[in-house]
Amino acid sequence: MTKHSPMVDLNVLYELEHLSEIHIVEYQGECKEVLAIQHEGYIGPPAIKAVLLQENGSIELISSNKAIALSFVNELDEYLIQPGPALAKSKLHEEIATKQLWKKWTVGNLYTTDELPPNSLFFKRYKVIEVAKPYKVKLPSEGGAIERIGYPEHPEVIRKKLGWKEGRENKLFAVKQGKNKLMVLVKRLD
């Protein structure tokens, strides 16, 4: 077993001889380490495991190594799903999305669906409230988080321009989709 930085490119690990497993370890919302396990004489694709460490134990998701066919969309449905660090690094979010019939939004590692996604510690679920042009969104007074994906302005600049205080229940995604810029207001379900 070898321990690697969370920044390691998984494609580099695939070059290791007799690689049987790759564990992506998440703790408190951060990818903490990547473990590569090699067994003498092992031949075949490695099992990919997303491991979520908690104070009272751990939860694992394991890849099936099946081919994945995702459908991509430009517009959002009723719900938005954002994979956590272990799912994002392991790319197991693609397997879950295929099983759950989620559609991959063309922005980042975000998915959308009209069905309420199941509750999971491996991803965050949001209800889409509004999709608008930059700075045209109607924001709730209780505040929220801001995350940018490909958007040129820093979240603090966006927050200042909007005059929106910090909060936990709501989130604003400032995204760049091709040449278009959008702001997506969502309400956290977890």
Task: Please name every model-derived segment.
Residues M1-D190:
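SAM-dependent transferase fold signal centered on methyltransferase-like domains
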